[in-house]
């Protein structure tokens, strides 16, 4: 069985909430009652928005992949960045696997750690093009702090053990001009460095 969010890249415009469940008839039958009890259909409007978005999926994803690689390369060469997590970088520990499996596109998500002397909240507030948000994978570039969002309720000691620290940021790269994104990041690093 495969459960996939249609809210992120498939939707791509931060304007729907949807998902898909795919699998054999046997597996789907085992959860069908839950779907009927809890509601498993999206509205006609959301279906229309999703259909609209899927038509541009390949164009959006290609641009996001291209931009993300450019941004990751910039960040990986900056003195105020401790680490960049992006499988498109040759120095990423899983680069060869990603290269084999991902057909040259490494995704639009770039995580990175700021130097310890930079306050991540101030860094995010200084950004002008990239916006802080809870939503990821839209056409616009957004940034989140996992300790304030996805991992907020996790024990801080456990978070630190797995590398989710106060200086870790998660950047969802959109389809803006890559130079504008790099300039935005560079300006914020300069202001806060």
Located regions from the model:
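Conserved PLP-enzyme active-site core in the AAT-like
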Residues: 1-80, 85
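PLP-dependent enzyme catalytic core of the Aspartate aminotransferase-like
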Residues: 118, 125, 141-193
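Structural motif
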Residues: 1, 7, 20, 48, ...
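Short, flexible turn/loop "capping" segments at secondary-structure junctions
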Residues: 12, 42-44, 102-104, 161-166
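Positively charged, small/polar-rich N-terminal and surface patches that mediate targeting and assembly
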Residues: 22, 83, 131, 137-139, ...
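Conserved small-domain helix->loop->beta segment predominantly found in fold-type I
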Residues: 69-128, 132-134, 155-160, 193
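Glycine-rich beta-alpha junction loops
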Residues: 8, 56, 71, 88-92, ...
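Short, well-ordered beta-strand elements within core beta-sheets of diverse protein domains
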Residues: 49-59, 107-115, 170-174
